[in-house]
């Protein structure tokens, strides 16, 4: 498995595809670059999803998130991109991606992107 930042999200078969369950992850070291100022933006990315047939492999997720480190992107765009890329890789029953960005200019920004319907009881 690679050790450099990569947009290649690896997956593995859901070990319990017949049972709806939630997977939650928190990635507190996310960074990207503000496209307006060129300054770094720091965020905690929170993922919650109910898998269907595939689950995301954690090291590939870490390397995927690292791949944004030098990319100029708006908070709204990168949060939605992460959600879209995870949907493409996993085809989950439901997913929520929250980008909780550090204060910049006195403003704290939280962006939430969702896909699918959350199964009842999960």
Swiss-Prot record:
Disulfide cross-links: none
Gene Ontology biological process terms in this record: queuosine biosynthetic process; tRNA modification
EC number assigned by the record: 1.7.1.13
InterPro entries noted in UniProt: GTP-CH-I_C/QueF, NADPH_dep_7-cyano-7-deazaG_red, QueF, QueF_type1
Pfam family membership, one: QueF
Subcellular location: Cytoplasm
Gene Ontology CC: cytoplasm
Binding site for substrate: 56-58, 75-76
Top-level taxon in the UniProt lineage: Bacteria
Catalytic residues identified in the record: 34, 41
EC main group: oxidoreductase
Catalytic activity from the UniProt record: 7-aminomethyl-7-carbaguanine + 2 NADP(+) = 7-cyano-7-deazaguanine + 2 NADPH + 3 H(+)
Task performed by this protein: Catalyzes the NADPH-dependent reduction of 7-cyano-7-deazaguanine (preQ0) to 7-aminomethyl-7-deazaguanine (preQ1).
Stated family: Belongs to the GTP cyclohydrolase I family. QueF type 1 subfamily.
Name of the molecule in the record: NADPH-dependent 7-cyano-7-deazaguanine reductase
């Amino acid at each position: 498995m690679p050790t450099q930042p990569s947009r290649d999200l690896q997956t593995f078969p859901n070990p319990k595809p017949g049972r709806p369950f939630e997977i939650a992850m928190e990635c507190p070291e996310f960074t990207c670059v503000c496209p307006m100022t060129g300054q770094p933006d720091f965020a905690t990315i929170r993922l919650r999803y109910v898998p269907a047939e595939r689950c995301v492999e954690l090291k590939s997720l870490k390397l995927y998130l690292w791949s944004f480190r030098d990319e100029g992107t708006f908070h709204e765009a990168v949060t939605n991109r992460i959600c879209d890329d995870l949907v493409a890789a996993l085809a989950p029953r439901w997913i929520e991606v929250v980008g909780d960005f550090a204060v910049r200019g006195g403003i704290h920004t939280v962006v939430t992107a969702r896909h699918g319907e959350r199964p009842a009881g999960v």
